[in-house]
Regions:
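Serine-esterase "nucleophile elbow" of acetyl-processing enzymes
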Residues: 1-47, 51-60, 177
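Alpha-helical cap/lid subdomain in secreted, periplasmic
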Residues: 30, 50-188
Length: 188
């Protein structure tokens, strides 16, 4: 079976839901690919870039999914720094001829996150920066001819369905929506 490595943060890992409810683990359960979930709760793009060789490149996977940036924004980092890090990871994955998919991070809900996750003054900055991150990621995907999954738009469209656990992370319904969209994009 072909190897598919998913690298990212808690949105890739499946924070807050049972393992079998995580969108990445649902893809693994299809038994069509050998899936490695390298999502780490709280991870940022500098950290992902730092571990990219060990977790991804050295394994020579046929497919790579990469999503990050929300935690960077929650640390006050710029969209440019996120894009620079993701671009380096794209170049590295292309150097081993992997098929790459970029995840565009979902929206966040600052009011809900302040109440249910933890208080932070940076939620509004993150919320305002995510559309810019989305636009820059779309440009990056176009420049490198890389596929993407637009979880930002997907979550925006499904917001009325109560898909969030805490304003940042998705609940089991949110993960199911992500899983179905990923299956379409991955042709599974």
């Amino acid at each position: 079976m072909k190897k598919f490595i998913f690298i990212g943060d808690s949105l890739t890992y499946g924070y807050g839901v049972y393992r079998e409810e995580s969108w990445v683990n649902k893809i693994s359960a299809l038994n069509k690919l050998t899936v490695f979930n390298k999502g780490i709760n709280g991870d940022t793009t500098p950290s992902m870039l730092n571990r990219f060789f060990n977790d991804v490149t050295s394994k020579i996977p046929e497919y790579v999914f990469l999503m990050g940036g929300t935690n960077d924004l929650l640390c006050g980092r710029s969209v440019k720094s996120i894009i620079d890090n993701i671009e380096e990871m794209i170049k590295e994955a292309l150097s081993i001829k992997s098929n790459i998919f970029i995840g565009i991070p979902p929206i966040i809900i600052p009011k809900m996150a302040n109440k249910l996750f933890m208080p932070s003054d940076l939620y509004n900055y993150c919320e305002k920066s995510l559309p810019l991150l989305r636009a820059e990621l779309l440009n990056l995907c176009s420049n490198y001819n890389v596929s993407y999954i637009d979880f930002y738009t997907l979550c925006n469209k499904n917001l009325y369905k109560n898909i969030f656990l805490d304003g940042i992370h998705l609940n089991s319904l949110g993960n199911d929506i992500m899983f179905k969209e990923a299956c379409k994009i991955f042709s599974l």
